[in-house]
């Protein structure tokens, strides 16, 4: 809990704070525009809205560029623990808002229930992949981005095909409550995997630096 509170306090000192806040606001605005204009039937609205959580991760992880942080006892927490904890909590809050919106829309436009649950299911899937991507992208950005895009594009195509043939019987039968539980579970699991990957890469970087400082 202390790390979580400290992480949120540190956001105000994040790298390029104004730029990140502007981008976060832009992504949120784009998400709202897509959601409102499509009445929640367009996946892009929820997608942009949920990805604003990545900025919390980015603002903390970039603090490691500071020489002060590199020599601080807080280095590991700022590079591994806090970004994951803070961004995961942000994702949980954003997802709660998104689920509440979908619930309200289902009550207002019950004829679109199928579409709302399809888009929510796909957003959960994409967000899970994005969280894992964050765990490795700051170490292997280009490689992880290429793999992420290929995997997401392939899986999205497969998922779209599956939903097209099965969404009426499978996804609709889940209901908004079960989809919400699935989403929360995916975010928490994504956070755990993200933490483990970040921790593994941190040890790898530390080992590499030690080896380079003691040449044979």
Could you describe each region identified by the protein language model?
Residues 210-216:
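Single conserved hydrophobic/aromatic residue that forms the stacking wall/gate
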Residues 1-66, 81-209:
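Hydrophobic alpha-helical transmembrane segments of membrane proteins
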Residues 76-77:
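Alpha-helix N-cap/start motif
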